[in-house]
Amino acid sequence: MNFIKDPIDRFIKLETSSSIVLFSASIAALILANSGLSEAFLGFWKNYITISLPGFELSKPVLKWINDGLMAIFFFVIGLEIKREVLIGELSDLKKASLPIVAAIGGMVFPAVLFVTLNQGKPGMEGWGIPMATDIAFSLGILTLLGKRVPVGLKIFLMAFAIIDDLGAVLVIAFFYSSKLIWTNILIGLAIVALLSILSRFKLYSKYFFFIAGIVVWVLFLKSGIHATIAGVLLALTIPIQRHIKTTTFYDKGQEILDGFLEECKKESKDKTILNHKQLDAIDEMEELTEKTASPLQFLEHRLHGWVAFIILPLFAFANAGVVFSFSGDTNTVLASNIGLSLIIGKFVGIFVISFLAIKFKISELPKNVNFMSLAGVSFLGGLGFTMSLFINNLAFTDEVLIDSAKIGILLGSFVAGLLGYLLLRFSATKKNPSAN
């Protein structure tokens, strides 16, 4: 089972480590926003950066370059994860996927319904999509704090429903948080995506061509009214999952290259600092062979995951989490409370109750060594909306008061949900769960 377990372990370790960086960036943003440097810190993100080419100009504030540009890479990685999970991962088997699917649906619908119910007739109704999100990095980070007490099945369940939750968030952004649509740009962008899919289908994949085409699609979507990050998801779905060469071919060819390299080394009387041309050619061949052994999808996911986890998401949190904690007349405490409650209660009820019913009616089954109390704990962790909630917040509102009020609700709601989830899991877990080994 190592071929399944090892990638999952690597994913969890990466998400756990990144959650620490993400948390640190968020705390730093909150400290700066509530210090004497507040005006300079918050004002910095409003400075404009312009890219100007003959016949083309793109000018946006720093905050928009992060939220529309860098976050498109984040959504590209989400798209890669979704495609992998659906084709060969936990979501490829309907029986195994049924519980994460119903949990994710409940975890999206109930918070939105609760928010609309609580906020009926009050300012900020556009924010109904904010409590639907789950931050996979933070939720997995808290789960990993419990170490071997947590069964692997519970971690896989959390990963799976969080990925489906991300897919739901993408659809919500595409259909409900897009502005006036320019159909010419949309259709051209979709035509390019379709072309890339056809090229991928016929094994005509070129990372350089796909990269250039991806930038064109991003610009088209940016100027179309659909949020530019959707381009990242669509482009990810065109990346091939098939490998160019078999692992046995890699071994045989690799051995041949290494043997040639070794022969060149033996010709030298001593280990020289400078390699000869044949040795350099061998290194180039080995690098090309190594890249072809992993599928383009797996290669890109592996290469980009670290950048997203340790650079893009922390930078996003640093730019967006800064909010002045002032419960004065300027803060919409009702909106903040409603978002917070929807994340804590709505997520818990949606994930746990729907999962419980699915299990009782034999639609799904609990993962191995998982009990209902630990399922309840993970249901609370689903209320850690954080990065995705902050992202939707910026799309839902234009009023600074509503944006900041929602941020307070997101931060407090995520904190309480995370704490409740940790405590429930801490009490439900045994001192050492053998299934975690």
Model segments located where?
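Hydrophobic core segments of alpha-helical transmembrane domains in multi-pass membrane transport
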Residues: 21-34, 74-80, 110-112, 192-197, ...
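Hydrophobic transmembrane alpha-helices of secondary-active transporters
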Residues: 55, 59-88, 307-327, 345-352, ...
